[in-house]
Amino acid sequence: MHTQQLISQIESQYLKDNLPEICVGDTVKVGVLIQEEDNKNSGEKERIQFYEGVVISLSKLKNINGTIRVRRILQGIGIERTFLVHSPLIKSINIIRRSKVRRAKLYYLRTLTGKATRLKQRLIKHYRLIY
């Protein structure tokens, strides 16, 4: 077996298979596992912290190194955070809203402020199957 095939076989064990179909422009809510030190019980405490924002870039989601970059505005300051999608520290990714965009990367949102950063909502038709 070649080394590349061996590497891809090992990496496939760690890929998450329950990821939603994420697109650039989506507003997502990412649940990240945070480990805190507890001074009273001298142990570690775990909790899930949610980070909500607009996906401005995607990179290789089918790969073990797949990332999403999420941007949000907090107290007038833009904050971007990059998440490894297949990391065990990512507990959940929920899509809140889908937006219609015409670019693969939304880096131009960095220069915009206020209402100019709004994206047009994309309507999704839900079909009901009748058997």
Swiss-Prot record:
Sorted UniProt keywords: Cyanelle, Plastid, Ribonucleoprotein, Ribosomal protein
Protein name: Large ribosomal subunit protein bL19c
PROSITE patterns linked: RIBOSOMAL_L19 (PS01015)
GO terms under cellular component: cyanelle; mitochondrial large ribosomal subunit
Stated family: Belongs to the bacterial ribosomal protein bL19 family.
Predominant place of localization: plastid
Keyword Electron transport: no
MF GO annotations: structural constituent of ribosome
Superkingdom of this protein's organism: Eukaryota
Localization in the cell: Plastid, Cyanelle
BP GO annotations: translation
InterPro entries tied to this protein: Ribosomal_bL19, Ribosomal_bL19_CS, Ribosomal_bL19_sf, Translation_prot_SH3-like_sf
SUPFAM superfamilies in the record: Translation proteins SH3-like domain
Reported function: This protein is located at the 30S-50S ribosomal subunit interface and may play a role in the structure and function of the aminoacyl-tRNA binding site.
Pfam families named in the record: Ribosomal_L19
